[in-house]
Each structure stands twice: as structure tokens, then as C-alpha cells.
């Protein structure tokens, strides 16, 4: 019993160093927030209204609306195996959803 008390009394207490993050992020308060439309134009993506206007004009590419995003994302989706792809929604199911359920 006496030996364990002596061992614990002779232990050295270590000082814990304060945490210093390895990743430095820029100060967000200094940077003004860009307008959403400006950010889309600078990224080269079509704005939401232009996609809608293309669809209303009868565009021949329904895949454009289905796979919105960068072109590489659309290519990845096309190469996915069938079990990982989104199930297509039938016209009847779309109408059911638009109605809000059974009549």
C-alpha cells in the first residue's frame, strides 16, 4: 500500500500545450460576399432562369434539367451502374405528386 502512494507522488505532471490548428483559413470578414448571379457567371454555369426558358421553348435535351451541374458530374452519372442511378419517375407518379396525394 505504501509503495503505490510513493509511486503516484513521484510522477511528473505534464503541461498540456494549447492546440494550434494545422489548417489556416482566410479571414471571412475581410472578403465581401459576391452576388449569386455574379458567382454563377464567373463559374460559367447557366443561370436558373435561362435553364427554365430553354425548357419552356421545348429544348430537345431533357437530360440538361435532370443532370444540372458541371459536365463532369453528368458524365459520372451516365457511367454509373444501374443499381446506383436514380429511378426514373413515371408521368403518372409525377401527376400524383403534383396533386399532393390521392384525390
From Swiss-Prot:
Record-level GO BP terms: 2-oxoglutarate metabolic process; tricarboxylic acid cycle
Modification N6-succinyllysine, positions? 5
Indicate yes or no for the key word Nucleotide-binding.
no
Q: Where in the cell is it found?
A: Mitochondrion
* Domain of life (superkingdom): Eukaryota
Q: Which GO terms describe its cellular component?
A: mitochondrial inner membrane; mitochondrion; oxoglutarate dehydrogenase complex
Keyword terms, alphabetized: Acetylation, Mitochondrion, Phosphoprotein, Tricarboxylic acid cycle
Q: Where is this region: Disordered?
A: 20-69
Biased-composition ranges, Polar residues, are 47-56
Oligomer and partners: Component of the 2-oxoglutarate dehydrogenase complex (OGDHC), composed of OGDH (2-oxoglutarate dehydrogenase; also called E1 subunit), DLST (dihydrolipoamide succinyltransferase; also called E2 subunit) and DLD (dihydrolipoamide dehydrogenase; also called E3 subunit), and the assembly factor KGD4. Within OGDHC complex, interacts (via N-terminus) with E3 subunit and (via C-terminus) with E2 subunit.
Task: Give the protein's biological function.
Answer: Molecular adapter that is necessary to form a stable 2-oxoglutarate dehydrogenase enzyme complex (OGDHC). Enables the specific recruitment of E3 subunit to E2 subunit in the 2-oxoglutarate dehydrogenase complex (OGDHC).
Family assignment from sequence similarity: Belongs to the alpha-ketoglutarate dehydrogenase component 4 family.
What is the protein name stated in its UniProt record?
Answer: Alpha-ketoglutarate dehydrogenase component 4
Q: Which organism is it from?
A: Homo sapiens
Amino acid at each position: 500500500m505504501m509503495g503505490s502512494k510513493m509511486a503516484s507522488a513521484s510522477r511528473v505532471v505534464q503541461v498540456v500545450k494549447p492546440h494550434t490548428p494545422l489548417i489556416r483559413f482566410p479571414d471571412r470578414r475581410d472578403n465581401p460576399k459576391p452576388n449569386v448571379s455574379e458567382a454563377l457567371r464567373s463559374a460559367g454555369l447557366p443561370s436558373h432562369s435561362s435553364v427554365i426558358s430553354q425548357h419552356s421553348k421545348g429544348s430537345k435535351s431533357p437530360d440538361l434539367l435532370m443532370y444540372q451541374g458541371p459536365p463532369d458530374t453528368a458524365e459520372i452519372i451516365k457511367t454509373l451502374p444501374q443499381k446506383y442511378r436514380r429511378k426514373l419517375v413515371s408521368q403518372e407518379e409525377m401527376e400524383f405528386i403534383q396533386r399532393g396525394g390521392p384525390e
